[in-house]
Amino acid sequence: MKKYAPYIFIVGLFLCLYGTLQVRPIRWDMTDDKHYSLSEASKALLRQTDAPIEVTLLLDGDLNAGFRRLKKATEETIEEMGVYGNLSLTLRSREGTKLQDSLGLRPIVIHEREQNGKTAQTTVYPYAIMQYKGRKAVVTLLKNTRGLSGEENLNASIEQLEFAFMEALHLLQQQETPRVAILEGHGEPDEAHTYDLMSALSKYFAVDRGNLSPTLPSREGDTVPVNVHILDGYKAVLVIDPQTAFSEQERFIIDQYIMRGGAVLWAVNGVRFSEQALQSNGFTPILPLELGLTDMLFRYGVRVNPALVQDIQCLPIPVNVSNDPQSPNLQPMPWTYAPLLLTSQGSPITKNMGQVMSTFVSPIDAVGGEDGIEKRVLLATSTASRVTATPGEVDLNDLNPDMTAFQYQYVPVAVSMEGVFQSAFAHRMMPEGIESDEPIRKTSARTRQIVVGSGSILLNETQKGQALPMGYDRYSGMQFSNRDFAANALLWLTDSEGLISLREKSVVLRLLNDKRAHEKRVQVQVISTILPVAILAIIGGIVLVVRKRKYERV
């Protein structure tokens, strides 16, 4: 019995270890980029589930190598999700179009050139359907960013898989839709020009529009005081392209809303101009736009400058180059006042996002130094920009500017801020017309703000009374990432669970050299097939020789 004791001990230890791992499995992600790990925010969200979750994967069929990689990564993400929380995930693939058509999902057509020179066409549905407690959510697996190659888009899609599934699960778990408010009363764009913005936000929020001005008369003829808590029911407030100044009461209400932890998206221009005058006369003067917000924003940590940026990387506009008014000849010409903005890869708001379309944008400076506010540039110009100060003039004839004047690089036009802010009313009296039962708050709870140097980024154009998509240029037919920017900005402002940070996940893209792979193809095939057999043959031969010599001695 003692002879077999070590073996019994080893077998017993193995069985105990196996039983322990069955009850409490240990998962160890040894990849550099933690590709197979979920964040703590995702684990917490999954543990909150109290009913089974069913996932139907529609990405199936005759897929190329890139989409097979995306499918495998999706299955791995779903498998990892199944480890945490009270849930049961099922993976099913469907090739038919009945389910897809019922949900209005559009397929992606892939054209690939085969080795014989022919072009093959494949239709795929890069979607997954998530069901929880009778509710459904569509998860889009493929993120198609303009300007990126196919491999880069697939890699970006893999990076965003965890966020895509967690976002869908968060929406399915949500019992009450959070509310956001768009402020009015200062010449802001009408609902027709914010239609697509409201449509994009309606997936996540209930969107209200309202006026803060205390204009309702009382019986005594005075205005009715406005309660300082009027905005407290909203997760975030949007100030989009105002044209007239804010009153002292409105400024105070917004300031104290921020002090109580409210989040604000400011999309304000530093310059006053007239697009109508530009279209009818061919030019418009540009002057500083006085909104009464300069001191507030400066106190919070940024300054929207009374100037406009110009950029060589810009949208074209149709211009009549014909001298004959009876025979117009419209040609696309670069319009430097409509810059195509670069997005920062260092923020979860703009990571893996394409360019953002804009017109008449003011530059933004970060101020305050060591004020404890974390500031990140979200949008910036290209490496060939210039800044036009006010007062000045914008002229349509200025379509061939001096290229040597574009000396600025990466001018910030959108900045995010997070931290504890100082009140703009810290050492001032409370304005008249305010109803409040508490003293002025001088410092805020930890909160977030975003400042954008133009309202155009969040607006859509209209054509024949119909709203066009946000970020769509009707002259070139190109679609930019304005819609994603708006949605991600609001998700970041209102994110208390840390889910938006999942967009910062990075997966290293390790690509083969296609040319070298083709040249070495036969060599690699020979080595991978013959070498293992040769090694086995050598080992087998050595074993036979050793055994033969051993038994010859006997």
Map each language-model feature to its residues.
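C-terminal signal-anchor/stop-transfer transmembrane helix together with its immediate cytosolic
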Residues: 1-32, 511-554
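Juxtamembrane extramembrane loops of integral membrane proteins
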Residues: 4-244, 248-251, 269
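Glycine- and acidic
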Residues: 27, 60, 184, 278-279, ...
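Intrinsically disordered or highly flexible coil/loop and linker segments, enriched in small
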Residues: 51, 178, 306, 426, ...
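A short, polar/proline- and glycine-enriched secondary-structure boundary/capping micro-motif
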Residues: 148-151, 389, 462-463, 511-513
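Acidic, S/T/G-rich, low-cysteine, solvent-exposed domains in lumenal/extracellular/periplasmic regions
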Residues: 163, 174, 190-498
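Short linear, low-complexity motifs centered on an aromatic residue
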Residues: 180-182, 313-315, 551
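Juxtamembrane amphipathic/hinge helix adjacent to a transmembrane helix
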Residues: 492-520
